[in-house]
Structure formats: structure tokens, C-alpha cells
Amino acid sequence: GDTEMTPARRRLLLGGLALGGLTLSGVVAQRSGSLFNSCQALLPPTPAVDELIRWAWEGVDARRFLDCHVHLVGTGDSGSGIEVNPQMESLFHPLQYAQRLFYLNAGCVHDAPGRIDDSYVERMQNLVDGLRPGARLLLFAFDRFHDVEGRASRQRSSFYTPNAYAQAVAARNPQYFAWAASIHPYRDDCVEALAAAVAGGALAVKWLPPAMGIDPSSPRCDRFYAALAAAGLPLISHAGEEKAVHGGDQQAFGNPLLLRRALDHGVRVVVAHCASLGSAVDLDQGESAPQVACFD
């Protein structure tokens, strides 16, 4: 119908919000200290909500609870090695600039020089304190975009969070965090990097194929799949349409059927965002088949 939220209409709306956000962000930030997030650790007391939360935790051992999809971001101002694409800090790229503002706000991070990385970690600790004792978060490292020759490209990477930083944050705060490595399978040293991650206590590997330039069905991934299966670590991989992280912007790599190659190599695969948007070619009907919804 006329009110259907098509991809084109959604992009137009997001672009408008981004432009509007640039105008309003300074005003809201000055008046409230953040953009929109009130930065509370706990929900306001509400009987219905309290009962729902109590029911959700019933029978769950919080010591075995791990929120396994938590991005670790920042600006690199702590010497963490984090990199952010310059477009996310440029007014000439309003959508990505606005995204950066929203992400920082969501993490209750403020533009205090030298404190952004640390403030983000402190906010996550604050949120864990609002959970049941023993619950932890799985922090994601995030590798750069790489081309088909395995060469990293900072210009095509939205952001980069080193494995070493994710490992260090988790090691300093084991009561709050565990960590997941991010290793591009086209890298010459991908198998060695995986061995180092396993030795450092990584519990999983994180990919975002459309942003990182990873075709999960490519034979280039085979040696990494073999090493990952041998290590017994799961692969947490995005599938579906990707809007939050541009990077390489190769949406076809979000086709969930491409991950069958990992399964065929014995890798345990967690498909992230399986209630998300997006359409892809139904490869079971051939590569020239029409596109269908990624998830039904």
C-alpha cells in the first residue's frame, strides 16, 4: 500500500533524519548532556515489566548467561588501536556522521578527549550491574575490510576494533566480559591469528560479511573453516540486509545460504539478526533465481 516502508523510502527517511540530526544534535547534547539516551542502568519500576523480567530469568543460572552480541567500539583515544572511518566524522557524509553520534549516545559516551574508549567500557559495566549477578557480555573485536587478495583497506572499513583490545578489556574485567575475535578469512595469517585468539581465551569469531568483504561461500575461506572447526569455536556471522555498518557495502554477502560452506566444514554457525530485513537470491533454485526474503 501507499504506507509500506520500502527500502527506498526507508533510505530517504534515514537520510532526512541524519540531516535533521546534524542540526539538532548540538542543541540536545548541550541541554541534556547526551542526544536521546537517559543512560539508566535499570528500567523504571513498573509492576508488569518487573514481572516479565522475573519470569524471563526464572530457571536461568546467570553464571552461565552470556549476551553474545555486543560490539566494542570507541575512537582509539585510549591507545586501544580502534580506528574509525573518517567519513563517520565528516559533515560531508551526513548519514554516517549521524550514525556515529547515535552510536556514541547509545553507549552513553560523551566527547571528552581521552575518555571515549574508557567511557564506553564503563557504560557496559554499568549495564551488567543491572543484570543478575554472574551475567556477562561477549565483546566483539571487528576486523577491517579486505579485498580478494587479502589486503586490508582502511578506506573501505567503517571501523576496526583489534583482537588485542577486546582481549585486554575482557582480561581486566572477567566478572563482566568475555570476548570474541574477528579474523578476516582472506588474510594470509588468518590461521595463525585464530591460534593466537584461542590461546588468548576467545570464545567465538565474529564476521560481518557485507561490511568486511567476506563471501562465506568462497573457497578462500576453507583453510580458516578447517582451523575454526578444529578449534571448536563458533562463528557468529551477520546475515540479511546490513544498514548499521557500511564498510564494503556488499549486500549479496549477507545471503544466509552462503554460510552452508562453513557448516559443511563442521563449523558451528550462529546467524545474527535472523529477524532482520533483506532479500537475497534463493541459491537452491540457481544463481539466476529471483530474490526472496532472507528470513521467513
Language model feature labels by segment:
Residues 95-96, 107-126, 156-168, 221, ...:
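Well-ordered, non-membrane alpha-helical segments in soluble/globular domains
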Residues 143-144, 183-185, 209-211, 239-243, ...:
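Active-site-proximal loop/turn and secondary-structure-junction residues that shape catalytic pockets
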Residues 203-204, 217-296:
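Catalytic pocket-lining loop regions of alpha/beta-barrel enzymes
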Residues 12-15, 28-140, 146-157:
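An N-terminally biased module of ancient metal coordination in phosphate/nucleic-acid-related enzymes
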Residues 4-20:
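N-terminal secretory signal peptides and thylakoid transit peptides that target proteins
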Residues 125-133, 162-175, 194-201, 224-230, ...:
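Acidic (Asp/Glu)-rich catalytic clusters
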Residues 66-68, 137-139, 179-181, 205-207, ...:
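Hydrophobic faces of well-ordered beta-strands that scaffold small-molecule active sites
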Residues 162, 202-211:
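Acidic, His- and aromatic-enriched active-site or binding-groove loops in soluble protein domains
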